[in-house]
Amino acid sequence: TNDEIIQQILYYLLLNDANPGKRLQAVSLLETVPAHNNKKLVLISSVLSETNTGVRLRALDLLSQFETDKTIRDACLKILLEDQNEAVRMGALSILANSPSADIVPALRVVSLMDQNEYIRERAVEVMTDISYLAEDQALEVIQ
């Protein structure tokens, strides 16, 4: 939906409505809103502050459609290290895995050792391995 007023109402509902069902409906409707910075920031705010797991998962899903910049990466690292819900942590790790960079390795090390979920620990190791291969490839390109 391109109507600016409707977008603002959806943002407001997602971040402020007391009813989790309405927040879930708002985040679902945001799928039709074009990707731009306001939408990204509202989704990040929702995923970091939302109490309802379904809303957080849906917001993360929509965030995964954005190019992973520092703001999204930082939010996903916070989620990965602090969120109580395994599915939400998996979603954050998935976003990080799609845009691997060396600056996430320290957090991935912690997750690979400390996360209570075996799959998340193993996936963190896989992402670190991918990052080390990327670093080797980049070093080879520099040498050549």
Residue ranges of predicted features:
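Short inter-helical turns and helix N-cap capping residues of alpha-solenoid HEAT/ARM repeat scaffolds
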Residues: 18-19, 51-52, 84-85, 116-117
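Amphipathic alpha-helical scaffolding segments comprising HEAT/armadillo-like alpha-solenoid repeats
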Residues: 3-14, 36-47, 69-80, 101-113, ...
